Amino acid sequence: MTPTHNFAFCVATSISFSCLLTAAELPKHIAHEAMWQDRGNISALNLTYGQGGEQHQPSGPFTFVKEDSSGTSPKFEIVDQQGTRWKAKVGEEARAETAAAHLLWAAGYFTDEDYYVAELTVANLPKLARGNQMVTAGGVVHGVRLERHMSGQEKGGTWTWARNPLQGTKEFAGLRVMMALMNNWDLKTINNVIYKTGKEKGLTYAVSDLGATFGKTGNPLVRSKSNLKDYQSTKFIQHVRQEDVDFHLNSRPFFLTVFDLPNYITRTRMQGVVKHVSRAHAGWLGGLLGGLSHEQIRDCFRSAGYSDVEVEGFAVAVEGRIAELTKL
């Protein structure tokens, strides 16, 4: 086998109404190993608040705890007067991640309790190593996604798209489709978390970082996050066959960047996450999401701080993708 063929082989294998239900009113039973939970009547869900519901929305005052240097987005931890800890994220991922978490929750998947706050005052806030441009006098931080630390929940490691206990189920296939629907181009294993929840420590599988969504997928020179124009310009379904379907998700770098072989292989494998998805399973998700109203979908983006024009644009684009799924 020639070096070129050998390399190719390596790569190849490699909403808001008072009658709406909040998260606290939903069934609490979780199977021992799960990534999806039946939300009941999806048309009655309140997508303004997502997983945490209205009762868990943040309320100050807040005090700085420490800065978090992980990942690419500026983050820091704060605590409210009730002692609840929150992780604050600022930058271009803040709005996209909030909207994505609320939409994913509505589809039945486990997510973090994410809220978007346009302006947040934090006591004892020092000069930040990252994101200090989002801070003004008096410790006022602008454009913040707050992730609530959930009591009784522990992280139990990570899971991979290639190997996990939910493979082959319609729920796992649906999650793969959701990643394509939201244009999530950052499907690294480190973003997939296993949570131990409740007294019996049942395991729930979740995608914990959804910031690289609602933009354009592609190589580092063209991909984007939280960009309406880019999101509207991309296609959703790539190929439809008798039994399965491929979705668009471009993540692989230029071939000329192959000197970073591990990254090249990792990004190539990410594209495979949304390929060869069962048509029946993708159609199941489409039927589920088809129960959402235009106003519910708008609430996903309104709750994330987008402008009226952006809210309408994103909602229409998402509805278009749902319509494509229902035709499978």
PLM features: residue spans?
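C-terminal catalytic region of ATP-dependent kinase domains
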Residues: 199-328
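Conserved ATP-binding subdomain of kinase catalytic cores across diverse folds
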Residues: 49-161
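Sec/Tat-exported extracytoplasmic proteins
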Residues: 80-82, 107-108, 179-185, 322-326
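Extracytoplasmic/periplasmic, Sec-exported soluble proteins
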Residues: 70, 92-96, 166-173, 184-185, ...
